[in-house]
Amino acid sequence: MTRVLGIETSCDETAAAVVTRGADEAPAILSNVVLSQIEEHAAFGGVVPEIAARAHVEALDGVIEAALAEAALSLDEVDAIAATAGPGLIGGLIVGLTTAKAIAAALGKPLLPVNHLEGHALTARLTDRLEFPYLLLLVSGGHTQIVHVAGVGRYERWASTIDDALGEAFDKTAKLLGLPYPGGPNVEKAAAEGDPARFAFPTPLKGEARPDFSFSGLKTAVRRAAGELAPLSEQDVADLCASFQFAVTQTLADRVARSLERFGKEHPKLQQPALVVAGGVAANAAVRGTLEDLCRKKGFRLVAPPLNLCGDNAAMIAWAGLERLESGLKQEGALAFAPRPRWPLDESAAPLFGAGKRGAKA
């Protein structure tokens, strides 16, 4: 039995977890502790990197202790240490990776620097024991990507956003409409009380052959509609959110369909290919419902993590570390590995350019 301690500090969650794979090959989460910084950043309407880094410094030791206690383990009983080394906010990455290095060096245990995006990419194998290959739709505050996942460390990016990430569009829409931080969940909550047919927002890139995404025009349409209605009533806000969210789901359905078709052609012998949706936006019920309908029509199975594993967490980091350890992909010179604020999952792909491809977590 291999037990890996995972540490995640790439943005505004301080997290630690212990994950294992038993003799029966079944993975298990022994603990998963996440301390959010929502209160620290709420007054600013978004994450302030300096505040986030300081909060990680103050909280990380206690979070690690809590994860070990929940797993009923001591540090000596952990077999390896995995930590997010990028992409993300540099201050937070330094805190988590430096702590992991200190623990690994003191105990003489392997250190596994993990790409945060790989954590999301492999979560479905932790929760559903999914076999390779599969298609990944990664939707979060920093990313909107479609990735072909052929194995551990074997990723090919098929599509990405040409401007804003989807989670970023949710957050900016929330801020525009005066909704509190975090934006995504509050837009979804308001949308539940709104009329999605009131505003006919655009479906960016609809019908285009390329599979990429675009969300900046949708965000601009919301701003224009809100400006024409100002001052906004509570129902106006709800209707704007509902119409925005509906346009998002229609955009996803149109864009993702192209990659599903390509995947089916490249893997014709798979009886029921899988689409994995991961990242914070994967917690949105409307997004999940739309993708379920799309997969049903295309002969795919939708695999979505439990809600507590959609956002940033350390269980996915520990699991990615365990997968790399078992695949013989240990990082040479890990103790000297520098945090990487920009670290693409598919390092062979062309660099991302443009306002929404600025790479904070690309």
From Swiss-Prot:
It catalyses: L-threonylcarbamoyladenylate + adenosine(37) in tRNA = N(6)-L-threonylcarbamoyladenosine(37) in tRNA + AMP + H(+). Fe cation binds at residues 116, 120, 312. GO terms for cellular component: cytoplasm. CDD domains: ASKHA_NBD_TsaD_bac. Keywords: Acyltransferase, Cytoplasm, Iron, Metal-binding, Transferase, tRNA processing. It is found in: Cytoplasm. Belongs to the KAE1 / TsaD family. This is tRNA N6-adenosine threonylcarbamoyltransferase. It comes from Chelativorans sp. (strain BNC1).
